[in-house]
């Protein structure tokens, strides 16, 4: 039941607040048309009085506002798409008007600027950028044309420039005006309350649980921030129902697939997840979720514990959200950079499992001894509230969302003919060489690289300094908290 104070507080959402929605149908710049109707569903909204402002599963109606496709590449190098969501649909089919704009697509290679989705440039790839720079070599190297031909022959990989967002794509909307939320659309607390004995047991266990994973050379890596309680079968079914995939083992085949995904700006949904240890043991399982980008994904490593709650296994997990990838010359491999706020990834994991109908209850155990800021094994700054999300699994039932089936009707995402795609790529490559294959653009390009490198370096130094500044008082607070908990 809503008390009067909570009802008054939660009856409206303010401009600037954000809502995550999930597409219920695919959208393509190649086949989409202005006016095509779209449907999505709310999956996350700001919390209010212990529940979300809008109930998960609430349908959002919208349409394609503008679309620009690449086609054969004669006019445009990149695709753009603007979608608008302007109504919420109540359970009794009433439409509530909203005003919101798109600000982010989760795990996407596409960018969003001023509410417009911007596709990738098929020639603005690692191999494409190197090719354009090789064009400057003829000014001092008469054999560079052979170099250029050899390079293009060695990397005949080009990304698809058209935009395609499949069913299940997560979009972040920002409210432009105040939204009055009807009573029937507001969420109530989801799931049943956790068993108090189970919670007390976990609170007793928490101080003895590992706080960080480590690399094989003993370097501190990710925060341990999730505990799953349930059988191995329940965990496997829960992640598959939520659309997550197992990570592949590292092999020659997986390395080739990673290279292809990196060069083609596409996803590798089962990409290997780097090995980390907990108490000297490798993860028993890894899970991940991505969309259309090799650089971005959410992933989880899990370890089975000897501890049991109500006869069920406790699985400890290290959850993080990756936002970029690069080839590390120091480590001689591809590495990913993580979202600084690791609690964001933890929340996304809990949300996805809950939407799949596989969660009996969720609660958070505070761990004051866990440092709030740290540097991971690849040099990225991380911050957290230190809490452990404890997810009690159950047999999946009544899902709010189900991933797209393999036999679902497909939409056209690119020219069907291989010949047409080959001609399009030649047109785009020629246009890129004409525009970028000159010394003026070369100087601009090198200047841009230098500025970006300097900004990235300055940002990493600043983040590292912030972490060290926060660590000093944490040491004393954590020690005092640990002593207090052990003396209870």
Language model features with spans:
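Contiguous beta-sheet cores, especially beta-hairpins with glycine/small-residue-rich turns
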Residues: 9-187, 257
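Second-shell loop/turn segments in exported
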Residues: 50, 161, 220-228, 332-340
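Compositionally biased P/S/T/G-rich terminal and signal peptide-adjacent segments
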Residues: 189-217
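Terminal, regulation- and interaction-focused segments at domain boundaries
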Residues: 208-238
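A cross-kingdom signal targeting lumenal/periplasmic-facing segments of multi-pass membrane
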Residues: 254-456
